[in-house]
Amino acid sequence: MGVVLSPHPAPSRREPLAPLAPGTRPGWSPAVSGSSRSALRPSTAGPGPGPGTGWGGTAASGRWVPAPAVHCAAPRAAAGHQQHHGPPLCSPDGAPRRFKRRPGSPAPAAQTGETSLREQPHGGPPAVPFVVPPTLQGRDWVPLHSGEWADAPWDPCPASELLPHTSSGGLGDACMVGAINPELYKFPEDKSETDFPDGCLGRLWFSVEYEQEAERLLVGLIKAQHLQAPSETCSPLVKLYLLPDERRFLQSKTKRKTSNPQFDEHFIFQVSSKTITQRVLKFSVYHVDRQRKHQLLGQVLFPLKNETLVGDCRRVIWRDLEAESLEPPSEFGDLQFCLSYNDYLSRLTVVVLRAKGLRLQEDRGIVSVFVKVSLMNHNKFVKCKKTSAVLGSINPVYNETFSFKADATELDTASLSLTVVQNMEGDKSQQLGRVVVGPYMYTRGRELEHWDEMLSKPKELVKRWHALCRTTEP
């Protein structure tokens, strides 16, 4: 059926029809109800093609063509189908009609998404604007292995109802393709400020940087935490030494009534690049009481090895405080080291930490001291390893680790000999003292206790001080 569409509002049912405009052919009624389902009014102004019929509709060429004037609802165009606006396909007598486009008349316009309101040729009513609805996509995703990936449309704003719904109203664990998933970029949690071992005296954070050209050692004192004060309140300060020189030191400001002080102070030591690797940085943490007396809480020893000074950036380091031994040194000095045995790998580990109170032979020139670690079996030499030499200090610090291959069946007859040796001028050397640890066959006292504790705590480092004795090397 033909439908007459008019942009002008339709008159009320009770009002008379408006008079025909000049030039309007009889039998035409352009009035249409404003509702999409209003019926068309038949025209009675003149003769038509038949009784009770009117004229309406437009052809694709812009000509007015007759159409039956009946009361009907305007059909809606289905998605993907074009609505027919042309002349009726049959004549009033039922015979099919054939239409020819006049020469010079414009060709039918191609369908577009939007048309403008314009007057049609031959005095017809203006065309009604319309918009073609967009086609709906059936899915928002395309499998990666599918060949449709290149031709698939991309929607920058996907419908929210197609995404997983969570109780909080967000996207939950869903992540769009191309977006960054923050779960993949989580850094491991820093537990240095939360995990403190049993019996910890406190922890100190500092930074070390060495300027090669200016020969300056830059030390940054950052903070301390979990300090164990002898009283209810703690007022800490830190003294910095550059061993072996213990006469000169630098001191931080005192922080009042806190066990977790924040220092953020910087210190400079002038030291030659030739001797920097032989120096040891010492931090002594004190508590200042009401009488302004200094009570030692603990200390940190940090050897300035080559690997710690590589690079242009400043290294931030933390160390646990250690209690300073209050026992007077033995006659020939003392040596501190750790023992550990891994029964699964059959590996015996020795960590040489430091020595104190050494009796150096300072008769000639500059001297240096190192420690020689020897593995013995049935008092026979098996293997030997040496630490680096520390220049002219009676309290050298090493912090060096050595490992030996030893089966569990050999531990009953094996022993370790640690000898402190002083280098003299030329190729001469002098033994300053020696410690032997092992089973009951070779040792007694603290040396035997250290060995037995190592066997009872596999894969753990057991640390102890031992007095040096002056004996000949086997």
UniProtKB/Swiss-Prot annotation:
Does the entry feature the keyword Repeat, yes or no?
A: yes
| GO cellular component entries | exocytic vesicle; plasma membrane
Per its UniProt entry, which superkingdom is the organism in? Answer: Eukaryota
Q: Which CDD domains match?
A: C2A_Synaptotagmin-15-17, C2B_Synaptotagmin-15
One GO BP:
regulation of calcium ion-dependent exocytosis
Q: Where is this region: Disordered?
A: 1-62, 75-128
Q: Which family does it belong to?
A: Belongs to the synaptotagmin family.
Q: What is this protein called?
A: Synaptotagmin-15B
Organism phylogeny: Eukaryota, Metazoa, Chordata, Craniata, Vertebrata
